[in-house]
Amino acid sequence: MDRIYSINGPVVKVNDAKDFSMMEMVQVGEKGLIGEVIGIDAEYTTIQVYENTAGLKIGEPVKGSKMPVCATLGPGIISGIYDGIQRPLTAMTELNGAFVAMGSALPALDEERVFDVTVTVRDGDTVKAGDVYATCRETPLILHKCMIPPDIGSAKVALAAESGKYKVNDVILKIIPDGESDAVPLTLAHKWAIKTPRPVRRRKTIKTPLITGQRIIDTVFPIAKGGAAAVPGGFGTGKTMTQHQIAKWCDADIIVYIGCGERGNEMTQVLEEFSELIDPKSGRPLTDRTVLIANTSNMPVAAREASIYTGITIAEYYRDMGYHIAIMADSTSRWAEALREISGRLEEMPAEEGFPAYLPSRLAEFYERAGYVETVSGGEGSVTVIGAVSPQGSDFSEPVTQNTKRFVRCFWALDKALAYARHYPAINWMNSYSDYADDLEDYYAENAGEDFIEVRRRISALLIEENNLMEIVKLIGADVLPDDQKLIIEIGKVIRVGFLQQNAFHKDDTFVPLKKQLLMMKAILKLYDESAAALSKNALVSDILKLGWFEKLSKMKYDVPNDKLEMFAEYEEAITRSFYEILISGETA
């Protein structure tokens, strides 16, 4: 029996251990704390413990499992809330109360829950990795598809159960893999190592945006299904609120929300709000398509790393069924801090700001598991990763933000000044970018309008021009500007307040369809073009402002319901009439 030699926080060492292998899951101490082997040398085996090690003593036993840290994948995951190593927190609360007891070893899935299973294969059928052998209704929104595990090649069905009611551990199928004689039993669930990406047939070209209903995201800085985005911002800039809003309204089939080292109250807020909110497409609560991984700031530091990998493994599992998954990781900085703490305890040579030298490779391992793929069974699915980054003091030059930028193509930089000015989402349009816009042009042309890309380009150009002029205004004031530049300042304000700013508590403004976003931009450009034409005919900016259209378009997000888009045509006609009248009155004068 191998025994503990030293304890340093979550890092435990065992001496003279010959039986352990790298990345093996172990049980540490008399209480069987879950740990993982992270280092082996001639003298010691180093173990990272995913639970609180308070009370652990030298000499206590360490048992190997001969398998890596795994997630249990099967029906019953959706609507669940788990800790970083996929222990069900609801069941643990009933067993141990409000706090997680050391060494709690509850199964990830409810083994007593009965599912109405439809078996889709018969005796003698030939099956291969990824083939669906049974289906069951997991929630009213999600049809769960039980698949042949990816590590099994071609096989023949030796025995298939009849359709009926089964629990997750009941044997549904017995298969004989090619080249073997022994039958392998398959239940509704199987295990998969969390640090091993699930295989795919091939990655596909990204062509479809993740529609969030947030104008600055969908129009200005879009993210594609299968893409990766970073949401960096200092304290109070709205990282969590932005992720909550995307999780509520995006058109992904399933949301995996990972609370990694953040406040417990935020996870409570997700639980409360998602159970009350109704999915507009199905009429069901949002919890029917949500998985929560809660590893809050007062939980063991080492488990933050496991929570990230557990979440993305669950996402890949549902992706293989053909679903589109969105992952919200809040926050990857807390995970990086956990890496730094454990690296320090291991006495590794620190790199920039004390983070370990392997920080970039760990971030890459996570973000590269996003993608739009053809699954091993020939279907399509995607995993979209949106990771919050919490740089101290809003310093975007720190290592986590800079290394994250290397692996994402969408960067939503949150601005403290915008947040404190109550401008939400507080995404700074000058510091943010999206490399997906060009890939999504065909989708926007087909589903929003042929002129969407050109309209978007003009809106972005006006924002850049306004930003440049604001530098001058800060120095010498707006009064000295010529009228054409005053017009850009005014139209920029309409774009910022009337289009980019969004009210999450307003029934029509919390989610805005793509076609309304286009019509709003076209109305703003109509006002700008008519104003510029009037200025060229010697009208004054002051007279144009008196028409009231700048204020009216700033409020159109509230005044035009999402189901009455024909009102925009009336707006444009009224704008044309107003400017015709101002020009006529000017000529008469």
Which residues does each PLM region occupy?
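N-terminal accessory targeting/assembly segments
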Residues: 1-101
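Short, surface-exposed secondary-structure boundary micro-motifs
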Residues: 17, 31, 67-68, 86, ...
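Short beta-alpha junctions and helix-cap segments that line functional grooves
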Residues: 23, 49, 64-68, 145, ...
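Short, compositionally biased
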Residues: 39-45, 75-86, 142-163, 183-198
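Short histidine-centered loop motifs in beta-beta connectors
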Residues: 49, 54, 116-126, 156-165
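P-loop NTPase nucleotide-binding/switch module
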Residues: 94-150, 167-227, 242-245, 280-299, ...
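P-loop NTPase catalytic core
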Residues: 219-220, 226-541, 545-549
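C-terminal amphipathic alpha-helical interaction region
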Residues: 535-589
